[in-house]
A protein has these predicted regions:
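Sequence/structural signature of beta-propeller domains
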Residues: 1-222
């Protein structure tokens, strides 16, 4: 309600798709409709009530009010005028989706209704060799996405080009005492873009700093 003055309070809103209230975006096998990779949807926002959530049903009430239904939303990042976020178990194989939201140039103003923001299904695959359970995400200095996994098997660091092509950067070779592979978390870059930081969550927890010619990316080969 007061741009640039968050301390004054405002309204909690949820993303909805224009003309498709309560849209199920999961693309699970039992979903009532499918959304294609690259498909772009107009966005509007619905106000949420009772946001202190006394009945622990805010998400359910949001969908009933018209908000889109996303599954297991986790990592999110804003960069280059776009918002990217992961749905860790989205897609037909339930191994992840990456969505992109491009805000309207009138975001937050009445004119937004005539020129809405755009939501696009940016990445979705049924091949776990390319991506499995995308979780934390960041935007690299050269414009690619860097995505880390919280999968059921090996945990990888993946890259995604602006065209949506996936490639592999690294694999977590560490194994915990019980034989499990720990998830990778918190990828981010140094201000000069030369160092990639990330965490391995357990076994024990560690933070790594990796130098590299990061712009020399190469497509994944499987």
């Amino acid at each position: 309600d007061h741009p640039g003055q968050l301390w004054r309070g405002g309204r909690l809103q949820a993303l909805a798709v224009v003309g498709r209230p309560g849209l199920d975006t999961t693309n699970w096998p039992d979903s009532p409709e499918a959304i294609a990779v690259g498909e772009t949807l107009g966005v509007q926002w619905v106000d949420l009530e009772e946001i202190d959530n006394p009945g622990n049903d805010l998400a359910v009430r949001g969908v009933a009010a018209g908000a889109a239904n996303f599954t297991r939303g986790e990592g999110a990042w804003f960069g280059n005028g776009e918002v990217y976020f992961c749905c860790t178990d989205g897609g037909p194989a339930k191994i992840g989706q990456i969505w992109r939201y491009r805000p309207s140039r009138f975001e937050g103003y009445a004119q937004e209704a005539s020129e809405p923001g755009e939501l696009t299904l940016f990445v979705e695959t049924e091949d776990s060799r390319l991506l499995e359970k995308c979780d934390n995400i960041t935007v690299a200095p050269w414009g690619d996405l860097i995505v880390v996994e919280d999968g059921d098997r090996e945990q990888y660091i993946r890259g995604v080009t602006p065209e949506g092509r996936l490639y592999t950067i690294g694999r977590n070779a560490a194994v915990t005492a019980d034989g499990e592979k720990s998830e990778i978390t918190g990828p981010c870059f140094s201000p000069d873009g030369t160092i990639l930081f990330f965490n391995v969550q357990s076994g024990p927890g560690r933070t790594f700093a990796v130098r590299g010619p990061w712009a020399r990316r190469s497509p994944a080969s499987v």
